[in-house]
Regions:
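Active-site-adjacent structural elements that line small-molecule/cofactor binding pockets in enzymes
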Residues: 1-107
Length: 107
């Protein structure tokens, strides 16, 4: 399907971006076109990141991370490209599990 991932766009820009896409679809004769809007935040880490971890943009407890993702959804994002920080494969897998077990149920 069709979609767009605005790179570096702030939440307040999403409604305008979506409007531009809808108008372009209308002008192309596709008034009922459906499309996905993605969000790709910087690196994420569930919990308090260790001091020796490279910087992560989306950090905090599961409630905070879920609130941030819900805010993205409220402005029109419906596809989330998340990438988690981890110093080892085990830590990375722990982050993935924490997202599935602790954050996803809050979405």
């Amino acid at each position: 399907g069709d979609g767009y991932i605005p790179m570096g766009a702030s939440r307040d820009q999403y409604p305008n971006i979506i409007d531009i896409i809808r108008r372009a679809a209308d002008e192309a004769g596709r008034p009922d076109a459906t499309f996905d809007i993605g969000i790709m935040p910087g690196w994420a880490y569930i919990g308090d990141p260790p001091d020796d971890l490279p910087p992560a943009w989306l950090t905090g407890d599961p409630e905070h991370i879920a609130a941030e993702l819900r805010a993205d959804r409220e402005v029109g994002a419906n596809v989330f490209h998340l990438k988690f920080r981890g110093r080892t494969i085990e830590e990375y897998l722990d982050q993935l599990a924490a997202f599935g077990e602790q954050v996803r149920p809050l979405l």
